[in-house]
A protein has these predicted regions:
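Extended hydrophobic alpha-helices typical of membrane-associated regions
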Residues: 213-270
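Membrane-embedded alpha-helical segments that form the functional core of polytopic membrane enzymes
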Residues: 1-9, 96-107, 147-167
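Helix-coil boundary and interhelical linker segments in multi-pass alpha-helical membrane proteins
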Residues: 80-96, 134-155, 206-221, 264-270
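Multi-pass membrane catalytic core of lipid/isoprenoid biosynthesis enzymes
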Residues: 22-89, 181-216, 253-254
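Acidic (Asp/Glu-rich) catalytic motifs at the cytosolic membrane interface
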Residues: 1-27, 48, 162-185
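Intramembrane alpha-helical segments
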Residues: 28, 54-145
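C-terminal ends of transmembrane helices
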Residues: 6-11, 57, 104-117, 165, ...
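Small-residue-rich segments of transmembrane alpha-helices in multi-pass membrane proteins
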Residues: 124-139, 157, 186-190, 250-266
Length: 270
C-alpha cells in the first residue's frame, strides 16, 4: 500500500509541476506506419525527438489532482494501519519511526519544494528503502534479527528496484531534461544509462549466484529458480538494450519476484 501511495503521490506532484506534459501514452501506436508500410506490416519508427511511450499519467490525462492526492492519502493510511498492526504484534515500537521515514521518503521523492528525485538522489533512496529497509525490516519483524543473507537479499532487491527506476527514467530522459528533473539517466545519457541499467541487473544476479555457490550443496530447486531469475534478467537486459522499455519493466518486476523465490529456496532447502 505504501508503494501504491508513493506512485499516486508521484503522479500528483509531477502532474501539477507539468513534468508529465507531453509524455506519450502507452499503446500499440509506438510505431507510425506509412500507407505503403501498412500493406507490408513494416513499421517506420517515429522520429527520435518524439517522446518515448509510457503508461498514462493520471493528472496529465485530466484526472483531478485532488482525487489523485486523495488516493495517495487513502493508500498511505492503509499502509499505516498495517504497520501499526505489525508493531502491536511484535512489540517493536521503533518500527513507527521506520514507517514515518518511509512516508516522508515516499512523498519527498517528487513532492515538496525540494524533491530529492529531481536532484540525482532518487536512485539512492530507492536502493535504501525499496531494498534494504523493506527486506531487512520484514526479516526483523518475522525473526527478530537481521542476517547476512537478509542484507544481501535487500541489496539484490534494491538493485533491481533501481534498475526499474532507471528504465522509467531512460524512457523519459528527454522530457525530464526539459522540465529540470535531474536523474542519473539524464546525467549519463541514453547510451551510458542503458549500460548502467543492464549492469545493475547483472550485479544483482552475480551476487545471488555467488551466495548460492557458497552453499555447501545447493539444492536442485534452488538452482532451477536461479536459472529462471537469470533468464528473466537477461530478457530484461535485451529489452532495455533495444529500447523496449514497456517490455523491460514487467520483466524487471518478475525478476525481483524470482530473486525472492530463490532466497526462499535457499532457506527451505538449506
Amino acid at each position: 500500500f505504501l508503494q501504491v501511495a508513493a506512485n499516486f503521490a508521484n503522479d500528483y506532484s509531477d502532474g501539477i509541476r507539468g513534468t508529465d506534459e507531453g509524455r506519450a501514452v502507452d499503446s500499440a501506436r509506438s510505431f507510425a506506419k506509412t500507407p505503403s508500410a501498412e500493406s507490408t506490416s513494416t513499421p517506420e519508427m517515429l522520429p527520435a525527438s518524439q517522446p518515448q511511450h509510457g503508461p498514462a499519467r493520471l493528472v496529465a490525462s485530466g484526472v483531478s489532482p485532488k482525487k489523485v492526492l486523495a488516493a495517495a492519502g487513502i493508500n498511505a493510511l492503509i499502509a499505516c494501519l498495517c504497520g501499526l498492526a505489525v508493531v502491536a504484534l511484535t512489540g517493536y515500537w521503533w518500527f513507527i519511526l521506520v514507517g514515518i521515514a518511509c512516508l516522508v521518503a515516499g512523498w519527498c521523492y517528487v513532492g515538496g519544494k525540494h524533491p530529492y528525485g529531481y536532484h540525482y538522489l532518487g536512485e539512492i533512496f530507492v536502493l535504501v528503502f525499496f531494498g534494504l529497509v523493506a527486506t531487512c525490516g520484514t526479516m526483523f519483524a518475522l525473526a527478530g534479527t537481521i542476517s547476512t543473507e537478509g542484507m544481501l537479499g535487500g541489496a539484490n532487491v534494491g538493485l533491481i528496484a533501481v534498475a526499474v527506476l532507471c528504465v522509467n527514467n531512460l524512457r523519459d530522459v528527454e522530457t525530464d531534461r526539459t522540465h529540470g528533473k535531474h536523474t542519473w539517466m539524464t546525467a549519463l545519457g541514453r547510451r551510458n544509462g542503458t549500460v548502467f541499467a543492464i549492469a545493475l541487473l547483472s550485479v544483482a544476479v552475480l551476487l545471488l549466484a555467488a551466495y548460492i555457490l557458497l552453499l555447501s550443496t545447493p539444492a536442485m530447486p534452488t538452482i532451477a529458480i536461479l536459472a529462471v531469475t537469470c533468464a528473466m534478467c537477461a530478457a530484461a537486459a535485451v529489452a532495455i538494450a533495444r529500447k523496449k522499455y514497456g517490455e523491460a519493466l514487467p520483466l524487471c518486476t518478475f525478476s525481483s519476484l524470482a530473486l525472492a523465490a530463490t532466497y526462499v529456496c535457499c532457506v527451505v532447502f538449506a
